[in-house]
């Protein structure tokens, strides 16, 4: 399915955003969001969609990931300077809602060993799930660092009750080509999730944390 955002429009938006950001340097690395307005969609009746897509370039390099690991994974995490918790540490939280909420807030994502992932509802209750941060599985056949990179590269589109959504697709430290590739991939994936594809898209903008929105569609 062809994109309705031409290459020229895409680069115009991305370059406009990066130039505006370069003129006003902020004290932090601004995130770039893709903002989507939908139409001909009834969140009450139509199926709410959700889907994840892996981008080519990591949109949020500072994303914090924690390993909930068995002994082997905890040792590996320690060796790689990755934050981790073992079953004992999770037991100590004692299903305390406040503590579980605090844990969920401290990290952007979690990875868990197979032996632990089954115990999480029992050890922590529904807190991580409620926060939308239930751990992804980390097997011993996978590279831990590779899996962390994969988690950092993956974005999620989730339709809630409103007709607009936004998702982080990059940051202002990226080259325009990298950002354009991420934006393009995100748009095409999102459109594939929609019932009537492009007929459901009202508007598309890219925007950095502090910058003005740039219209793509």
From Swiss-Prot:
InterPro entries registered for this protein in UniProt: eL8/uL1-like, Ribosomal_uL1, Ribosomal_uL1-like, Ribosomal_uL1/biogenesis, Ribosomal_uL1_3-a/b-sand
GO molecular function: RNA binding; structural constituent of ribosome
PROSITE patterns referenced in this protein's UniProt entry, alphabetically: RIBOSOMAL_L1 (PS01199)
Keyword Ribosomal protein among UniProt keywords: yes
Entry similarity comment: Belongs to the universal ribosomal protein uL1 family.
PANTHER family, A to Z: RIBOSOMAL PROTEIN L7AE FAMILY MEMBER
Name of the featured protein: Large ribosomal subunit protein uL1
């Amino acid at each position: 399915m062809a994109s309705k955002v031409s290459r020229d429009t895409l680069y115009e938006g991305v370059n406009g955003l990066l130039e505006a950001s370069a003129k006003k340097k902020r004290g932090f690395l601004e995130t770039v969001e893709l903002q989507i307005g939908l139409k001909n969609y009834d969140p009450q009746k139509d199926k709410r969609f959700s889907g994840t897509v892996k981008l080519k370039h990591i949109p949020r390099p500072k994303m914090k990931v924690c390993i909930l690991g068995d002994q082997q994974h905890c040792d590996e995490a320690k060796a790689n300077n990755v934050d981790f918790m073992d079953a004992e540490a999770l037991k100590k939280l004692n299903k305390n809602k406040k503590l579980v909420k605090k844990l969920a807030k401290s990290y952007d994502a979690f990875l868990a060993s197979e032996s632990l992932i089954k115990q999480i509802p029992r050890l922590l209750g529904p807190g991580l799930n409620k926060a939308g941060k239930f751990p992804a599985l980390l097997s011993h056949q996978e590279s831990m660092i590779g899996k962390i990179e994969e988690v950092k590269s993956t974005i999620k589109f989730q339709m809630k009750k409103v007709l607009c959504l936004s998702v982080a697709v990059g940051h202002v430290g990226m080259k325009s080509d990298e950002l354009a590739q991420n934006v393009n991939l995100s748009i095409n994936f999102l459109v594939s999730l929609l019932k009537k594809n492009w007929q459901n898209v009202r508007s598309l903008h890219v925007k950095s944390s502090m910058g003005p929105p740039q219209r793509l569609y």
